[in-house]
């Protein structure tokens, strides 16, 4: 038979009636293909190859459509066969829609019918698959390699079978691919329910006309994201009606199709189907179990097709009205492509089925949602099972959570609804009144985990905490005005005595302070005032550990006494200690609460001690003669011992007169009294007070050791000195009587670059001065060291009288104990020794015979205090006026003071560089300047009625620090005008040659803390001592490890990923789906032939609105562990190292030891530093927690609702239409936060441009750790990310809110899912620029309630707090 001349015909198999037309077509198609393989008998392989291509294309076309028509997904589309689809370049379809009208009464214009013409693009797609036939199999199938044996015949059958299996696999891929492609097409045009449903409510005549409407819409979107996400998981157990309501909203929020088609999917009773709901198998099963009612289990599905006509170049007009297939004639002609003569051969059989309806009954789940009958379809198993293609309706949802750590609640919120609900151990204080340091929450498995301050060591115990160089460079580009230089300028004292220097300072004070300094105003502000948009100085509050201030530029500090007229600039100084954090950001209540915590189970002053010492500090009649005695003793142990009898009589007299203790303003005197007068020389009660006072100072010293981890010295200093500034030799006591602190300070080494100016010149020590050598008018750099008790040789080297611990205790006493009792009502004073020593020599002592006994009663004429001996201007008068009973023997001892005299009160200015714990290339040039008085005194309560004091006869004010700068004491300097006295009430009158506020170690916040505190003296001493703990990385590592609250809090940010199960709803006939002619391409290859099958597809939406919508219905599983893995910047970030190599190595070691993100092995020379891989994982991918330093006084309510971790709202969605508005919303703090208009921010250390948090997490600065890979904070701090997401949100609202207006046929409207709308169900935190609060608490008791299923009945208990879950996960984890 000559097959070359015979036309090829597709064999037509016998049609077997089976009651199901679709199944019949499928069976007949399979037989056709198999019969073709059986009939191949020829040597002409080319002929049969062409016949095979044609047959394969027809076969795939047929069964692809047949299988698809069995799916409920076919409800949503109109299938159209379009063989010429390959030739279409730019297809469009035109719709005409007539808008409905309402006839109205009244003076309304009469409406006319309106027609809208829409043009829509055809989107072209394709499906492809491939298989191969080996050369040997081709030979067997073609018969070229047959040898007539049974073996070759068997091999030929096996080859045909294998080919059939390959073709079946390809066919199966086209069947699955058709369903997958259409599902993705529907998803591409389906906006989330959380967007589509609110738009129907808030759209004003089809448009969002104003910013107000847009803001209202955004607020609603936020609410709907929280409520609608995972609605099935949340409510399927208890509130099933809410699930039904959400489903009804889903199927009713879409617009119907414009296709007026005769094809109708219906249930077995003939009710038309309105659409299809596609979801996962799990959600489908849960919906059918008690939530939705199954209306029917089968459906009548029409076998449909469409016809395409090409008219004009690149213009396609679709006849979208489906044509029902009435009989198998149409099946054969349009689906199998049979020739007419082949159809006539079966004419008799076909006529038997002419009356069969055009529908086929298939298995289906039909449910009623509201009043709409829909298919409920799950393609997960039918289409996607065992494939490597993910199911499109299983998605990912990224959520960012926020957890406040260490926030201190204001007094109004520190309450307990039932104080007895959580009671401490009997007899013990309630730890729930302490500032919180730990936060507890649940991980994905319901296990309780925690984060503490120690978890943040990897963030702040890093040298990036000290990197402010780039910040200075950036803010110096901005214009600044120097309103007041006082506090920001340091000079050396001018020539002359200290008294003259003080007078000159007050004469020129107004030049330095034309306005009120910023640092004094801030100390009196509330947190709301500091963070208000009207605070112009808020822009300089950028870092918790640095003060930024405007100062004179190009002036080397210390500068000239008269500040030069230069341009201003911005300077930065380390705050050094947490007590220097501004009071609004670290309030007095917090400091006192922390002090109370530290005082528990530690030494506390006896109430009698408190009363006696407090009374002395507040005694306005404190004997002036006591200050005279202090001055002549001037810290000399030798002189004290010589005057011991006189001192005893002074103490005893004052004790008996007032029941108060004398000399408590002088640490040296307290030490000597305890050492020499504590063995019965004084009344027992009085001795106990001095002893108790000293024990308290020593307890404060032990406090530092308790909060310091022992270790080897770093940079030549012990860790306790690196942890607390009072143990740092660089800081001198405010008053020194000898050179001991200076000598100990000199042992620090050159790294601290310490310098010392004594009266403006270099320092030099003098052993001691006797009366013959004294010069009260002496100036210069000489300091008297005091005469030692032993070894009196002026030629001997000058060595300290006491060990370094003496100086440490001295600083603790002056900086912690004295302010607690004085509350700012004390002042360091200069002494006029030129008048004191002559006064001492004026004592009148009656002559007594050799055999006479000295009288003890002042009534005796021989007693020195008898009225006949009270000569004016003598020392006797001072003792008499103070009612101090001294005898002759005691007064005779005063002659010993001339053997070791003081000449003057000398100002000392000491400077030092940062210690090894804070020294970097940036901070090494920053110097502190602290003033000290040598041979001065500390005067307690000012004696307004003492004439000698008012005239400045013996003492004059010389404040060295704001702690010792009572304005009332300026009355001892006659001649000051009223302006100076008034200014001193607002600004501490500390001369600029004693340092400046911003350059001092102890600054205004500490002084104001002592003044404003309402705590008792015990608590306040510990509170002040806590304020002197340093803010450097090494110091913080000690504090975190030992449980010390550092004075600031953290905002913890964590990002988790969840697998979601989504629901898609599509209206019936809402998509036109075109199928082109399948093409088979052969590619000869070595060893066989490759076949590539490609079929062009296209689709176009048939709606004038959104015809599909979807929602995240159920939570499948968390991918991440929702745990507590802290970030470690040593793994992700490179920055400036510490200057001291030992300090850098120490930090790396203590941070990385035990850290789960510690580096793996030694640091590689090349390549990336990777974390150590754990041996096992139990809870999933670890989610990293990042820490944003936050003021401890931040509004806790801010964290109870979704909020921006920066502390201020961001994103163009809040902005106006101006180009700069989006940037201003993020960074312009002169405007209120859009979410909280009364304040600019809740965290100035993170929300402002160039702030610490901004520099740490903003990818704009090209830091390798600030990336979306490592950092969950990246998306909130990087402006490009914020703007991109904000533009998505703005465009999303504009696109979705646009209505269909009357338009010409040239207008193209594509109702596709707006760009960025997927973020509503995939990444809402980036879209809204908000993180969600997670269920967390600082107290585990608040997470435990007596009722099953009830968590967090109370939101607070004293200082502890509970944050409720306000995220989309709320209600998804019942066990939590």
Swiss-Prot record:
GO molecular function: structural molecule activity
Pfam family, one: Herpes_MCP
Cellular component terms (Gene Ontology): host cell nucleus; T=16 icosahedral viral capsid
Main location class: virion
Subcellular location(s) per record: Virion; Host nucleus
Coiled coil feature spans: none
InterPro entries to which the protein is assigned, alphabetical: Herpes_MCP, Herpes_MCP_upper_sf
Cysteines paired by S-S bonds: none
Keywords noted in UniProt: Capsid protein, Host nucleus, T=16 icosahedral capsid protein, Virion
Domain of life: Viruses
4Fe-4S keyword on record: no
UniProt KW Cytoplasm keyword: no
Task performed by this protein: Self-assembles to form an icosahedral capsid with a T=16 symmetry, about 200 nm in diameter, and consisting of 150 hexons and 12 pentons (total of 162 capsomers). Hexons form the edges and faces of the capsid and are each composed of six MCP molecules. In contrast, one penton is found at each of the 12 vertices. Eleven of the pentons are MCP pentamers, while the last vertex is occupied by the portal complex.
Family membership: Belongs to the herpesviridae major capsid protein family.
Subunit structure, interactors included: Homomultimer. Makes the hexons and eleven out of twelve pentons. Interacts with triplex proteins 1/TRX1 and 2/TRX2; adjacent capsomers are linked together in groups of three by triplexes, heterotrimeric complexes composed of one molecule of TRX1 and two molecules of TRX2. Interacts with scaffold protein; this interaction allows efficient MCP transport to the host nucleus. Interacts with capsid vertex component 2/CVC2. Interacts with the small capsomere-interacting protein/SCP.
Name of the molecule in the record: Major capsid protein
Organism the protein comes from: Equine herpesvirus 1 (strain V592) (EHV-1)
Taxonomic lineage: Viruses, Duplodnaviria, Heunggongvirae, Peploviricota, Herviviricetes
Name of the encoding gene: MCP
